[in-house]
From Swiss-Prot:
InterPro entries: Gluc_glyc_Psyn (IPR012764), Glyco_trans_20 (IPR001830), HAD-like_sf (IPR036412), HAD-SF_hydro_IIB (IPR006379), HAD_sf (IPR023214), SPP-like_dom (IPR006380). Pathway: Glycan metabolism; glucosylglycerol biosynthesis. Involved in salt tolerance by producing GG-phosphate from ADP-glucose and glycerol-3-phosphate (G3P), an intermediate in the synthesis of the osmolyte glucosylglycerol (GG). It comes from the Bacteria. This is Glucosylglycerol-phosphate synthase. The gene is ggpS. GO terms for molecular function: alpha,alpha-trehalose-phosphate synthase (UDP-forming) activity; glucosylglycerol-phosphate synthase activity; magnesium ion binding; phosphatase activity. It is an enzyme of class 2 (transferase). CDD domains: GT20_TPS (cd03788). Transmembrane segments: none annotated. One of its GO terms (biological process) is glucosylglycerol biosynthetic process. Gene3D superfamilies: 3.90.1070.10, Glycogen Phosphorylase B, HAD superfamily/HAD-like.
C-alpha cells in the first residue's frame, strides 16, 4: 500500500503515543510505502529527513504538488517533474503581473509556485483570478491568509495521481490523509482517505459527500491509525493486530555507554579470557565508576570482540567489581573482529577523526563502512534499551556512538539521554563535509543534554545543527569568568545553553574534563619516581628542559614544533648546550598505517636537527618513540622548565593539565606553552598561548618561556594549578550529571534566575 500524507497537523501531529505507534508500524511493515504530500517546499522538508524518529519517505510531493522527488536520493521523479516544469511561467512573471496588489510574499522557500499572505477581502478580488488564468496558473487560497499561484492543473491530488499511475498502483491500495483545505484535492473521493481529528471545518464540510473519506476523531497520527482500522489495512484486524511495543524497561537507573569496558580483557597462559582493573592512566573510567559506589543500580554498555565460530560462550553480562560496585554490571555488545576493525579502528579514524579536527581533506568516506557504523550503533542502542530502568539516565560518550541517541529515542522514549563529546567539534563548514551530517545531527538532537569541553565547541555544534533543521534559541549565557573570551582562538563571549527543535528542548553545556589529581600525587610520591627525578635533576644540571608529550597524529603539530625548535636554535646560538627538547611520542597501533608517512617525516626531522646542532656531551633533541608509564612521564613533568604543547587542533588536551598538576604539587615554576587551538586554551589562564600555524610565533613564544622571570613563572603556575586542582575530574562528572538530572535548574542558571 501507499500512505500519502500531509505533514503539518497530520503526520507530524497528534498525541506522542499515537505518533510513536504509527511510526513503528510503518517501520515494521516494509510493504507500506510512504509519500509526504505537503505544501512545504522541498527545502523545508529536508530537516524532517534528519529526524531519526520519523519514517523516511519513499517519495516527496512538495510545493503543493509542484515538486516530486524520490525520498532517498531527492532526485526528481521523471518524467513527472518535467511535465510540471513545462506548465510554470516563472516567478518573475507572476511577481510582475500582481505587483500593483502589494501582496506580501511569504518568507519561505518556494519552487514552481509563488506564495503570498492575503486577507479574505484581497482574495475575493476577481482580477487575481483573471491574472492567474492569463499566466496559465491556478489560484489556491487556504486558512484565510495563504494565496498560492501554482502551475495550471497542478495540486496535491493531481501530482499524487500522477505518482500512483507511474507506480502502476490501484487507487484502492492508497490511503491519503490531511487536515486542511490545502489537502482537498487528494481527499476528493478518488482514494481512500482520512480527515484526521481537528481538521479544518471547511475540509470536513467539503468531504462529507465522499464515501471513501473517513472522518477520524483523534488528531494527527491517531486519526491515521483509526483509518488503518476503518479500511482494514494490515489485515482484518487492522492496526489492532500490531504487537510492536516499546522495549520493556530494565533495572539500571544510570547507564554508561562507552567504547571501552570498565576493565581490561586479556588472554591468560591457558588461553582463556580473563579480566583485570584498567592499567591505563585514563582517569575518566574510575570517575565514571565512582557514580556507582553508593550502591546505585547501573549498567555499563561497551563492545567486546567475539568470534562466533570460536566455540566460546559469550557472556553478555559480567560483574565489574562485586565489592566496590555491587549493583553495577557490564553489558557487553558482541562485535566480530571485522566490525571492530571497521567501526573503531578504520572508519572512526579515517572518516570522522580527520574531519572533526579540520583535516577534512584526509577523510575517507565509505558508504559500506557507514552501514557497519550504523549496525554497531544500533546494537549499542538495543542493548541500552534492554538494560535501562523506566526514566533512567543514559550517559553516552563521544563520536563513536553518534547514532545511538536516534535509535534509543525510538526504542525507549522515556529515557533521559545525555551525550558528552570528548573530541573537538568543528565549525559548520567543516562538519558539513561529512556525507551523513544530517543523520548525525538528527540523532544528537534526540538527546536531552549534550556537553562539550568549551563554549566554542557548543556554538560550533549549534551552527551545524541550524544548517540541518530550524532551531529556536531558548537561552544563552556569558562564558566568563569560567572561560577566556577574546584572549585565544577558541574563546567566545556568549554561548547557547538550550535550543528548541520543535519536538524537544535540548540543553547544552561546556564541561572541560578535569584531572585525577590524586593519581598524579600518587605517582610523584612513589620512591622509584623520586629517585628518577633526582637522577634527571643531576643529568640536566645547567640545561633547561623543554618537554613535549603527545600521540603520533597529524593533529598534534609534531612536525611544526620540531621545525620551530630548529629555528629557535638557528636564531639563538647562545642556547646551544643550554637547552634540550625531550619529546615523548606515543606510537599508533600497528593497524593505523595512515600515520606511517608522518612517522618517517618526524624521524628525518629529528636526525636533521641532531645532526646540525649536537655537540660532544650535549644532544639538542631526545626523541622517545614509545609509550612511557604514567609514573615516568610524571617525573618528566616535574623536571620540565617549559611544557611545549602545540596541537593544530584539539578538543581539550589533558597533558597540559597533567603538567600543571605535577608542577603545582611540587611548588614548581615550569611554564606552559599551549596552542591556542587546544580546547584547554579557553580554560587555562596563565598559559603562554601560541599559534602552531605561525612558525615565527612558535619560536618566539618558546624563547619567551625559556627566559621568563621566576616570579612571573611562579605566578602563572599558581593560577594554572588553582584552576586544575579545583576543576578536577570528580567535579567534572558531578557537574555534568547535575546538569543532566536537573535541567530546569540548569536553565534557570543560564537565565540568571538563580545564583
Amino acid at each position: 500500500m501507499l500512505l500519502a500524507t500531509d505533514l503539518d497537523g497530520t503526520f507530524l501531529g497528534g498525541d506522542p503515543k499515537d505518533r510513536l505507534s504509527l511510526y513503528q508500524t510503518i517501520a515494521a511493515h516494509p510493504e507500506i510505502r510512504l509519500a509526504y504530500v505537503t505544501g512545504r517546499s522541498l527545502e523545508s522538508v529536508l530537516p524532517l529527513l534528519a529526524d531519526p524518529t520519523l519514517p523516511q519517505p519513499d517519495f516527496i510531493i512538495s510545493d503543493v504538488g509542484a515538486s516530486l522527488v524520490h525520498g532517498d536520493s531527492l532526485q526528481p521523479i521523471q518524467p513527472l517533474q518535467s511535465a510540471v516544469d513545462a506548465l510554470w511561467p516563472g516567478d518573475s512573471q507572476v511577481a510582475s503581473a500582481i505587483e500593483r496588489f502589494a501582496l506580501e510574499r511569504q518568507d519561505v522557500p518556494q519552487v514552481r509556485r509563488c506564495s503570498y499572505f492575503c486577507n479574505p477581502e484581497q482574495a475575493a478580488n476577481p482580477e487575481l483570478l483573471t491574472i492567474a488564468e492569463s499566466l496559465g496558473c491556478d489560484l489556491l487560497y487556504s486558512a484565510e491568509r495563504y494565496l498560492d499561484f501554482l502551475p495550471k492543473g497542478v495540486n496535491k491530488g493531481s501530482s499524487l495521481q500522477a505518482l500512483i499511475d507511474w507506480l502502476e498502483l490501484d487507487n484502492d491500495q492508497v490511503l491519503t490523509a490531511g487536515d486542511t483545505l490545502n489537502d482537498l484535492s487528494m481527499l476528493s473521493g478518488q482514494f481512500k482517505g482520512v480527515c484526521v481529528g481537528a481538521s479544518e471545518p471547511g475540509l470536513l464540510q467539503a468531504t462529507r459527500q465522499y464515501s471513501l473519506v473517513f472522518h477520524a476523531e483523534r488528531a494527527g497520527c491517531g486519526g491515521i491509525l483509526e483509518a488503518f482500522v476503518h479500511f482494514g489495512f494490515l489485515g482484518k484486524q487492522g492496526i489492532a493486530a500490531e504487537g510492536k511495543q516499546v522495549a520493556e524497561p530494565g533495572k539500571a537507573d544510570l547507564m554508561m555507554v562507552y567504547h571501552r569496558l570498565p576493565y581490561e580483557e586479556f588472554r591468560g597462559a591457558d588461553g582463556k579470557l580473563q579480566r583485570r582493573r584498567p592499567t591505563s592512566p585514563n582517569g575518566i573510567i574510575p570517575t565514571l565508576l565512582s557514580f556507582f559506589g553508593d550502591g546505585r543500580a547501573g549498567s555499563w554498555v561497551a563492545w567486546a570482540e567475539h568470534d562466533e565460530n570460536s566455540g566460546e560462550t559469550f557472556d553478555s553480562h559480567t560483574t565489574v567489581d562485586a565489592e566496590r560496585y555491587p549493583k553495577l554490571t557490564a553489558a557487553r555488545v558482541a562485535l566480530s573482529k571485522e566490525e571492530v576493525d571497521i567501526f573503531y579502528k578504520r572508519f572512526s579514524k579515517e572518516a570522522f577523526w580527520p574531519t572533526l579536527h579540520t583535516f577534512w581533506e584526509r577523510g575517507q568516506f565509505r558508504e559500506d563502512d557507514w552501514q557497519v557504523f550504523l549496525k554497531v550503533n544500533r546494537a549499542f542502542a538495543e542493548r541500552t534499551a534492554l538494560e535501562a530502568a523506566e526514566g533512567a539516565t543514559v550517559w553516552l560518550h563521544d563520536y563513536n556512538l553518534w547514532m545511538v541517541p536516534g535509535y534509543l529515542r525510538e526504542l525507549r522514549p522515556d529515557l533521559r539521554i545525555a551525550f558528552f563529546h570528548h573530541t573537538y567539534f568543528p565549525s559548520a563548514d567543516v562538519f558539513n563535509v561529512l556525507p551523513w551530517r544530517r543523520q548525525i545531527i538528527g540523532s544528537l538532537l534526540q538527546c536531552d543534554y549534550i556537553g562539550f569541553h568549551i563554549p566554542r565547541q557548543v556554538e560550533n555544534f549549534v551552527d551545524a545543527a541550524r544548517g540541518v533543521m530550524p532551531l529556536q534559541t531558548v537561552s544563552r549565557q556569558n562564558c566568563a569568568p569560567r572561560f577566556i573570551t577574546y584572549g585565544c582562538a577558541v574563546g567566545l563571549e556568549r554561548m547557547t545553553t538550550a535550543v528548541d527543535t520543535g519536538n524537544r528542548v535540548v540543553k547544552l553545556g561546556a564541561h572541560p574534563v578535569g584531572l585525577d589529581i590524586e593519581r598524579v600525587r600518587s605517582a610523584l610520591a612513589a620512591p622509584k619516581i623520586r629517585e628518577m627525578m633526582e637522577r634527571l635533576r643531576s643529568e640536566l644540571a645547567g640545561v633547561k628542559l623543554i618537554l613535549s608529550v603527545e600521540r603520533l597524529d597529524y593533529t598534534k603539530g609534531i612536525l611544526e614544533k620540531l621545525n620551530a625548535y630548529e629555528r629557535l636554535l638557528e636564531e639563538n646560538p647562545e642556547l646551544l648546550g643550554k637547552v634540550t627538547l625531550v619529546t615523548v611520542c606515543v606510537p599508533a597501533a600497528k593497524e593505523m598505517t595512515i600515520y606511517d608517512e608522518l612517522q618517517g617525516q618526524i624521524e628525518q626531522a629529528v636526525g636533521r636537527i641532531n645532526g646540525r646542532f649536537a655537540r660532544i656531551g650535549w644532544t639538542p633533541l631526545q626523541f622517545f618513540f614509545r609509550s612511557l608509564p604514567f609514573e615516568e612521564v610524571s617525573a618528566w613533568y616535574a623536571m620540565a622548565d617549559v611544557m611545549w604543547i602545540t596541537p593544530l587542533r584539539d578538543g581539550l588536551n589533558l597533558v597540559a593539565k597533567e603538567f600543571v598538576a605535577a608542577q603545582g604539587l611540587l611548588d614548581g615554576r615550569g611554564v606552559l606553552v599551549l596552542s591556542e587551538f587546544a580546547g584547554a586554551a579557553a580554560e587555562l589562564k596563565g598559559a603562554l598561548l601560541t599559534n602552531p600555524h605561525d612558525p615565527v610565533d612558535m619560536t618566539q613564544t618558546c624563547y619567551v618561556a625559556l627566559n621568563m622571570p621566576k616570579a612571573e613563572a611562579q605566578a602563572r603556575l599558581r593560577e594554572l594549578f588553582d584552576i586544575v586542582n579545583y576543576n578536577d575530574i570528580r567535579r567534572w562528572g558531578d557537574e555534568f550529571l547535575a546538569a543532566v538530572s536537573d535541567p530546569q535548574e540548569q536553565l534557570d542558571r543560564a537565565l540568571g534566575l538563580v545564583g
